[in-house]
Amino acid sequence: MRILVTNDDGIHAPGLDACARIAAALSDDVWVVAPETDQSGVAHSLSLNDPLRLRKVAAQRYAVKGTPTDCVIMAVRHVLIDNPPDLILSGVNRGQNIAEDVSYSGTVAGAIEGTILGIPSIALSQAFGPQTRDNPSYQTAETHGPDVIRTLLAEGIPAGVLINVNFPDRTPDQVAGIAVTAQGRRDQKLMRIDPRKDGRGNDYFWIAFERRSADTVPGSDLRALDEGRISVTPLRVEQTDEPMMTRLAQVFEAR
């Protein structure tokens, strides 16, 4: 099995090395194609106005001046064009990718692009808390990741579906199990703009997030991480809302 590893934190991110080790526990044919620089929050963006630059870092390891989506396309359509990967692992992200994070995440986008290209794809993210944010450990992801992935591959990932896996901020032996979850939703009032001034008195701004309340919906990815469980969420690339499509068809046909 040939595995492609990518991420959004960049070619030098510790989480990328952790993901490569997870892949190495599953196969001896592992390739890494990741962004040259940190691409966190770029979502599923594609570089159309700037050329892509490809740099060979080491054997079977490349850096791309571009987004995670660019990296997957570069890998599948150029680097590995004669023998495409059988599996794409995107991560391990520094921080959780749950709820609305999924829409912004370059890590999840790497898996989305792989799914669009017809390759089974899994996004992997490691949550951290106030005590671990400065130096997050990927040991929980490394310990439990291979078994989770083997189980997913044994079951089979349908076409058009990607898997979003989040590991809790727990040591490997403290993980409370695995939960198959739905994508959660945060209180959007927690998002705010933090205004500041630079040394010359000019305004600048940060997008900031207040700490959310402890109330989460049972069965959601948010609740799973709160309970110290690994969250496994199947996501669809196809975003059509079929019930609404049916309703609108009836509305417009009746005009």
Swiss-Prot record:
Documented EC number(s): 3.1.3.5
Keyword line: Cytoplasm, Hydrolase, Metal-binding, Nucleotide-binding
Binding site for a divalent metal cation: D8, D9, S40, N93
Alphabetized GO MF terms: 3'-nucleotidase activity; 5'-nucleotidase activity; exopolyphosphatase activity; metal ion binding; nucleotide binding
UniProt remark on cofactor binding: Binds 1 divalent metal cation per subunit.
Compartments it resides in: Cytoplasm
Main function: Nucleotidase that shows phosphatase activity on nucleoside 5'-monophosphates.
Family stated for the protein in its record: Belongs to the SurE nucleotidase family.
Name of protein: 5'-nucleotidase SurE
Organism: Azorhizobium caulinodans (strain ATCC 43989 / DSM 5975 / JCM 20966 / LMG 6465 / NBRC 14845 / NCIMB 13405 / ORS 571)
